Curated annotation (Swiss-Prot):
Source organism per UniProt: Mesorhizobium japonicum (strain LMG 29417 / CECT 9101 / MAFF 303099) (Mesorhizobium loti (strain MAFF 303099))
Compartments (UniProt record): Cell inner membrane
Residues passing through the membrane, by range: 73-93, 108-128
Keyword Cell membrane in record: yes
HAMAP family assigned: UPF0283
GO CC terms in record: plasma membrane
Region (Disordered): 1-33
Predominant subcellular localization, coarse grouping: membrane
Similarity comment: family membership: Belongs to the UPF0283 family.
Membrane topology value: Multi-pass membrane protein
Protein name: UPF0283 membrane protein mlr0776
InterPro entries noted in UniProt: DUF697, UPF0283
Matching PANTHER family: UPF0283 MEMBRANE PROTEIN YCJF
Compositional bias (Basic and acidic residues): 23-32
Length: 361
């Protein structure tokens, strides 16, 4: 048995109080005095550009059509003077011909005079029709500008005038009857100017836009097929020009333009000006890369691939013609792009390639 332990004293050191120092330090940090920072120097770190995240060029919307530049005053004077000289030359030649026929036989002179009178009368009628067609095309341009102005100012009165003029312009189109009737029922309603123009665009021009897209796709398919089977490149170019001209005229007639011969040339010039402004007249490397990216080069033969490229060029011309001949600019409806036609055209070309390969076997 051990002896009991003697009592002893121990020194106890005080513990640190972190709970008190930490709040004080945090409070001092939060309550520090404000200080000024230099704002004249900023460091901007640009984000890395991923080429695979770039928007598809065929899905991008083409810029709106720009108004064609007016001819200079001296150019108008020159062509006007040339026209007067040509008219005088034709008149003098006709007069001399009639005099010679009267000198040879009186009945021949009277016959020539009657034919000249009939020709002049027919020419006057043709010129009147051409001027009316040109005036109708000019009315389309004015209507587009007035619609843009009504949307920008949000003016209900100007928008109502635009809607009434649009309804009268496409009154001969049965596809627009339901839309015109719907707009007529809303005449007494209070609607903002911009919304009224957009509503008229969707209700009246919606069916015409659907038909226009079908026309453009069918024209692109025909160009693609003819390019695939034609033996010469000259035939391809000639048919592309022919199909593009026919597509421009059909789209103008669809939207109520009814262009004549002179009106067609003016419309074609406006379409080409739009293509030149938007840079869409040439198929660039980016467009070819998009076609290759869709796997077209691996699925189609060389001729059918060339046909798809020509078909997409025809579709681009059709889009420009659609925007030029449309009475209202694209506001409520989405402006069509090449992406709307590429999938259907490539499917058509792949089907034709499969049929050709199967028949060859």
């Amino acid at each position: 048995m051990t002896a009991p332990r003697k009592p002893a004293a121990f020194r106890i050191e005080p513990e640190a109080a972190p709970t008190q120092e930490t709040p004080k330090a945090r409070q001092a940090e939060l309550s520090r005095k404000p200080r000024g920072l230099k704002t004249d120097v900023a460091l901007v770190i640009p984000a890395e550009v991923d080429v695979f995240d770039e928007p598809d060029i065929v899905a991008a919307e083409p810029p709106p059509a720009a108004a064609p530049r007016k001819r200079s005053l001296f150019g108008s004077i020159f062509f006007g003077a040339i026209g007067v000289l040509v008219s005088l030359a034709v008149g003098l030649w006709t007069d001399q011909l009639i005099r010679d026929l009267f000198a040879r036989a009186e009945w021949l002179g009277w016959l020539a005079a009657g034919m000249a009178a009939i020709a002049v009368l027919a020419l006057v009628v043709i010129l009147i029709r051409e001027f009316l067609a040109i005036a109708r095309l000019a009315e389309v341009e004015k209507l587009q500008k007035r619609a843009l102005d009504a949307i920008a100012r949000d003016d209900p009165k100007a928008a109502r005038s635009v809607v009434d003029e649009l309804s009268a312009f496409v009154a001969a189109k049965p596809e627009t009857a339901a839309g015109r009737r719907a707009l007529a029922e809303l005449r007494g309603e209070i609607i903002d100017g911009g919304n009224l123009v957009r509503l008229a665009e969707a209700e009246i021009l919606g069916p015409l836009d659907a038909r226009a897209k079908v026309m453009i796709l069918e024209a692109a398919k025909r160009v693609s097929l003819v390019t695939a089977v034609s033996p010469r490149a000259l035939v391809d170019v000639a048919y592309v020009v022919f199909e593009a001209g026919r597509l421009i005229r059909r789209l103008s007639e669809l939207y109520g333009g009814r262009p004549g011969t002179l009106g067609f040339f003016r419309l074609a010039r406006s379409v080409l000006a739009h293509l030149a402004v938007t840079g869409s007249i040439a198929v660039g490397d980016s467009f070819v890369q998009q076609i290759v990216g869709h796997g077209l080069a691996a699925r189609l033969s060389a001729k059918l691939g060339e046909g798809v490229v020509n078909g997409m060029m025809t579709a681009r011309i059709g889009i420009a013609a659609m925007e030029t001949a449309r009475p209202l600019p694209f506001s409520a409806a989405k402006r069509p792009g090449l992406g709307d036609f590429l999938s259907a055209l490539t499917s058509f070309a792949a089907k034709k390639d499969t049929e050709t390969t199967g028949s060859g076997k």
